Regions:
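Cofactor-binding loop segments of dinucleotide-utilizing enzymes, especially the Rossmann-like FAD-
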Residues: 56, 86, 113, 135, ...
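Central regulatory/effector-binding core of bacterial HTH transcription factors
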Residues: 72-117, 121
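Short beta-strand segments enriched in small/hydrophobic residues
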Residues: 5-10, 43-59, 157, 164-171
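Aromatic/hydrophobic pocket-lining residues that form the small-molecule binding cavity
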Residues: 63, 93, 151
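N-terminal helix-turn-helix/winged-helix DNA-binding helices
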Residues: 30-68, 76-79, 87-89, 99-102
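N-terminal helix-turn-helix DNA-binding module of bacterial transcription factors
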Residues: 1-48
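Bacterial carbohydrate/catabolite-sensing allosteric modules
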Residues: 31, 72-77, 125-132, 136-201
Length: 201
């Protein structure tokens, strides 16, 4: 390409290189099929361009849509996605948090089942950014919807229209969403001075 090694290095690491030299380097790379070593780049830049995504189940439509959106955004930003499926197993979530940290990914997105003390301890020890989806955890970047308020408003709407209301769904053991939904359901009854009968559950 007729340029110095330092110029090639800057090109490979997205540093400043004039457009004319950039085109010459790119032409030689395309002709030779050269691919820089990912390990060498990681050592040099301290970045892997990998983001780990831990999911509770792979066969969920809503999780699938989340992962598709995450994948699109990461790809547009030059990152690759590493996917870890836990089958709703808290121990597997902990294991994958450790594995991804050891792989030195640039970040972790956790779509967890239940955030336990072990999760909190491990998340606090991470030296990489972590984002938690579908749950609220104080002190962390979280993206979630308000299950409590959604259940409350839906139940209130049904009560106002005189529709027979029954609570269908999840149990108290489902801390990620179930408990909040149940509390929202009960609060809607309380708001209108009614009592939710036991057989509704």
């Amino acid at each position: 390409a007729g340029v110095s090694r330092a110029t090639v290095s800057r090109f490979l690491n997205n540093g400043y290189v004039s457009e004319e030299k950039r085109q010459r380097i790119k032409k030689v790379i395309d002709e030779t099929g050269y691919r820089p070593s990912a390990q060498a780049q990681t050592l040099r830049t301290k970045k892997t361009n990998l983001v780990g995504v831990i999911i509770p189940k792979i066969n969920s439509d809503s999780i699938g849509r989340m992962v598709a959106g995450i994948s699109l955004v990461l790809s547009q930003a030059g990152y690759q996605l590493l996917l870890a499926n836990t089958d709703n197993n808290e121990k597997e979530e902990i294991k994958y948090l450790k594995v991804l940290a050891e792989k030195q990914v640039d970040g972790i997105i956790l779509i967890g089942t239940v955030i336990t003390g072990a999760h909190k301890k491990l998340l606090a020890a991470l030296s990489i950014p972590a984002v938690i989806l579908s749950q609220r955890l104080s002190g962390y970047s979280c993206v979630y919807y308000d299950d409590f308020q959604a259940a409350r408003e839906l139940t209130a709407l049904l009560l106002e229209t005189g529709t027979n209301v029954a609570y269908i769904g999840v149990t108290d053991r489902d801390e990620a969403a179930g408990r909040q939904r149940r509390e929202g359901f009960l609060m809607a009854f309380e708001d209108c001075g009614k009592t939710a009968r036991e057989e509704l559950f």
